[in-house]
Amino acid sequence: MKQKTFEEIKEELLLRAKKAGACQIGYAMGLRSQSKADILKAITDNWSWVSRTARIVDAEYLEDNFAEEDLAEAGIYTQKYHEVTTTSFACDSATVKAYGSATVKAYGSATVKAYGSATVKAYGSATVKAYGSATVKAYGSATVEAYDSATVEACDSATVKAYDNSYVEDLTGNIRPQSGYAVIKDYYNHKIYIQKGRYQIIEVD
């Protein structure tokens, strides 16, 4: 397949964005793009809308039109295994291990392992394992395993397994603690679930 030029990619994406009703600021970023790096910056700055809401690009489009090193420079991973400490975007079959204060947005069938104070937003059928004091927001049919002191907010039909001292805010009504002293705050049924171990639960008004 013939490689598209920068000008062709820019024109195509601007047309897609216009048809999808892009916001003025996001569209202007694309319009001002002078290189593929600028286009990728516009994509990552509007990642959720571009890849999930309007579906302007997917992993296949990115792989077909941008070099792997250009995607990596922008923090976008569509395949293989990567370790990151900065803002990153994982989709398709990518596996990302996030450390420190890294922020990862995961889509499709991406897999993320989050440590330290990393933050993950998981959509679609993404899988996340959260350790340390990592924070996860799970949407769609995302699957999360929370360990240590990880914090999870689960929405839609997300699935969460909570272990150790993890804390889960459950908007699905389907999540229960697995082991350790995990706490589930169930907003759907207005209940709190605790693996109490040897501790006695005292209710206070």
Summary of predicted features, one role per range:
Residues 1-107, 113-115, 121-123, 129-131, ...:
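Short, glycine-biased loop/turn motifs at secondary-structure junctions and
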